[in-house]
Amino acid sequence: MTNQLYNQAQAFHRFFDDREPAAPKKLQQADLMNRVGFILEELTELAVSNCDKEEEIAQTFQEINRRLLAAKEKIMTKGMNQNDVIVQQADSLGDIIYLSFGSYVLMGVDPTEILDIIHNANMQKLFPDGTVHRDKVTNKVLKPVRW
């Protein structure tokens, strides 16, 4: 499954954002912050999925902020990571994937079909004029109105 997921993401990027390097390299700060922002957007959607009221959403975001501050404190306390930056980035992304799959396990959901649906939908992000539209700040591929 990992190869299939990587190949799907690679196909998306080759079509919409063909910047795959010839050799492994770290993400530069701007790209790193954009990727973290994309992940945070999805995490917040997940976090509020059980919320029925705006008050619950506000409470959820308070809890997210509390946990972010705790994570920051943990990082500040343990000191700088001595591994190469690319190792740190790859390890963190691997942990995110592993935790995501663990969440599927706890839900009793095989994600294969869901991930295929997401990939197929993402490959349809061309606008009616046949072009890709991007966010001016993050360079994220935008969804057409019909999407």
Q: Which residues does each PLM region occupy?
A:
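Flexible "arm" and connector segments at domain edges
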Residues: 1-147
